[in-house]
Amino acid sequence: VESRLNFFGNPLAGKVLKHINSANKVIADSTLPAATQELVKIRSSQINGCGFCTDMHTKDATHAGETQQRLNLVAAWREATVFTDAERAALELTEQGTRIADAAGGVTDEAW
C-alpha cells in the first residue's frame, strides 16, 4: 500500500508526523491495553480513509495476537458482539474524536 502523504518530502508533513508520534507515545505509555490501542488505531485509520495506516495497524494487531474475526468486525463494532464494554467505549471515543470535523459538537460529555 502506498502512502498518500510523504512525511519526509514536506517540512509541514514532518511536523505533523512528529505530533502524531508524540500522541502515539502517550497512548503507548498509558494503562490502555495494547489490544485496545490497536483497535483504536485501526478504527481511526478506517475513518480517515488511510489504507497504509489501516494495513499497518491491522498487521500490528495480528502480530500482537488479535483474532481475524475481531479485525474483520472493527468497522462494524457497534453491531458486533465480540468487543468488551471497555473496547466499545474506546471505539466510541475514537469514532467521535476522529470525526471532529463532521460534527460541530466534537466529543460528547457522555463519550468522554
Located regions from the model:
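Hydrophobic alpha-helical segments
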Residues: 1-112
